[in-house]
Amino acid sequence: MTVSDVSSRMSIFLKRLFDISLALSMLIVCIPLLLYCYWLVWREHDGSVFFKQERIGRYGKPFMMYKFRSMTMDAEYQGPALYQPGKDTRLTAAGAFLRAHHLDELPQLWNILCGDMSFVGPRPERQFYIDRIMIRDPRYAQLYAIRPGVTSYATLYNGYTDTMEKMLMRLKWDLYYLHHRSWRLDFHILSTTFRYMIVGKKF
């Protein structure tokens, strides 16, 4: 085993330790906020407050990703559809608020604790869209090398992906992160994400 291998394994271990520590801390500190978000969604929905959907994670393995429900129960009765900011009628009133501040993502703290996700990494996608992206750019498979994230470099600078062209652009940002990831870059992404969430800036 080379010095580079040891350094890489140590970096992966430390990032995982950081993810667990921060996720546990946030779950405790954010209990009032989690309860408030739960109540906002509960008063508008007859069904489940939580939305779960299969996504593809590290090593290409599927997992269930959790969110607070922000759309109507029948949002995808006609099949997979991309969210379109500002003009998506499937969004509920509470859901619009949660999405504006990205609070619908809070349940993914559980995904982090389970080891499915990291705080920072490429956003996990559905197999339906991965298959279509891979036809255009097979480099997507490189992203399977790391855990997907709650936030990402691509999310901050590419925003919501409501077209295939934006998905391909997001992939370029994700590949940049994959090959340039560092503690400094992760800190920049996390701090920028929290700042945008507080001010309600769209990203």
List each language-model region with its residue ranges.
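C-terminal terminal-structure detector
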Residues: D5-M10, A141-F203
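A hydrophobic, helix-centered structural microdomain
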Residues: D5-D74, N111, W183-F203
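Acidic active-site catalytic centers that drive phospho-/nucleotidyl reactions
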Residues: D19, D104-E105, D174, D186
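Positions in alpha-helical segments
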Residues: A23, F51, T92-A96, W173
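Short, glycine-rich, amphipathic interfacial segments at transmembrane boundaries or analogous
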Residues: F51-R90, T151-R170
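A short, structured surface patch at a secondary-structure boundary
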Residues: Q84-R147, L190-T193, M197
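Structural signature of FAD isoalloxazine-binding scaffolds in flavoprotein oxidoreductases
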Residues: T2
